[in-house]
């Protein structure tokens, strides 16, 4: 029946979103190439049906209703495809920003992720988007932390605990020697990146 595969694809998009939001590291499951192909084939079949119904001489209520339902099915399939692609592209964007635009395909392989989970178009998108980020961060905006949080901190100074040894860190307010299990009261802006990298834990 029309729309069944599109519903499965929407469920896959929800699963992908829950998987990305529920884990510490961003992950993408295998791209559902077969489902996407079936939906595209279904859309082209619906398009042919709609064109046939539009050309019918008899424009009674029945043919108008058939045409309307066919167009609704086609639009729903397209929306489901776009929702699936948008979910995956948002996760790819987050992966690229998390790695500051470094060669993300190599990093994915090193972290145990299979880049084969991405379609060829997604691989190209991720590579080019990562290149844009690295160009931005290496140019005139080098001094600005573009990967930082967009929400302002609620507290200027925070308590942090050191999770991993990191050596001496120079900040605006002095030098901190980050030794495992030690605690500091520091300015949040100075240690935001270390928290993201897993060296510090906000208390």
Swiss-Prot record:
The record's subcellular location field reads: Nucleus
Give the domain of life: Eukaryota
Do the record's keywords include Cytoplasm?
A: no
| One GO term describing the cellular component | GINS complex
- Keyword Iron-sulfur: yes or no? no
Function statement: The GINS complex plays an essential role in the initiation of DNA replication.
Q: Which family does it belong to?
A: Belongs to the GINS1/PSF1 family.
Q: How does it assemble?
A: Component of the GINS complex which is a heterotetramer of SLD5, PSF1, PSF2 and PSF3.
Protein known as:
DNA replication complex GINS protein PSF1
Name the species this protein comes from: Eremothecium gossypii (strain ATCC 10895 / CBS 109.51 / FGSC 9923 / NRRL Y-1056)
The organism's taxonomy opens as: Eukaryota, Fungi, Dikarya, Ascomycota, Saccharomycotina
């Amino acid at each position: 029946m029309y729309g069944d595969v599109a519903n499965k694809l929407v469920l896959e998009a929800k699963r992908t979103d829950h998987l990305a939001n529920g884990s510490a590291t961003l992950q993408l499951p295998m791209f559902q190439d077969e489902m996407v192909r079936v939906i595209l084939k279904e859309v082209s079949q619906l398009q042919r049906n709609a064109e046939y119904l539009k050309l019918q001489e008899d424009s009674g209520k029945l043919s108008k209703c058939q045409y309307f339902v066919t167009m609704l099915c086609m639009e729903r399939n397209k929306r489901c495809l776009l929702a699936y692609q948008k979910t995956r592209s948002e996760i790819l964007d987050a992966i690229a920003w998390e790695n500051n635009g470094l060669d993300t395909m190599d990093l994915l392989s090193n972290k145990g992720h299979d880049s084969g989970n991405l379609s060829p178009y997604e691989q190209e998108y991720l590579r080019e988007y990562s290149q844009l980020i690295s160009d931005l961060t290496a140019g005139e905006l080098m001094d600005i932390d573009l990967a930082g949080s967009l929400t302002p901190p609620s507290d200027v100074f925070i308590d942090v605990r050191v999770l991993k040894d990191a050596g001496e860190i120079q900040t605006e307010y002095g030098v901190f020697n980050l030794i495992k299990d030690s605690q500091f009261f520091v300015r949040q802006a100075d240690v935001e990146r270390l928290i993201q990298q897993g060296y510090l834990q906000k208390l």
